[in-house]
């Protein structure tokens, strides 16, 4: 299994999933059922930096409404952030 530190862009994936799950008022068990996995596995993803398989990542991104670019194209997100900072300074 890949390690989080070996996958740029996924450093916050677990925390993002947890925050989105709570924002949608889903229990960990309910979300685990939706992605057909054990709630302990989901807890490991959320809390212990476990990087799930690609199919599970895709399901979590869809269900939680997470921006796919953040994880699969982190450079784009950094560029957009830098551009937003430049624009906001001009406003």
Residue ranges: model-predicted function:
Residues 55-70:
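DNA major-groove recognition helix of helix-turn-helix/homeodomain DNA-binding modules
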Residues 2-3, 7, 69-91:
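Short, charged recognition helix plus adjacent turn
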Residues 15-30, 34, 59, 84-91:
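Short basic helix-loop element that most often maps to the first helix and adjoining turn
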Residues 1-23:
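A short, Lys/Arg-rich alpha-helix, primarily the initiator
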Residues 17, 31-32, 42-45, 71:
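Conserved hydrophobic/aromatic packing and binding residues within compact polymer-binding modules
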């Amino acid at each position: 299994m890949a390690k989080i530190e070996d996958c740029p862009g996924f450093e916050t994936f677990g925390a993002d999933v947890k925050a989105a799950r709570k924002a949608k008022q889903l229990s960990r068990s309910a979300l685990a059922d939706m992605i057909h996995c054990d709630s302990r596995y989901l807890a490991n993803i959320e809390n212990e930096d476990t990087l799930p398989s690609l199919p599970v990542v895709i399901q979590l991104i869809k269900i939680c409404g997470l921006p796919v670019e953040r994880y699969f194209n982190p450079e784009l997100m950094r560029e957009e952030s830098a551009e937003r900072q430049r624009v906001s300074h001009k406003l």
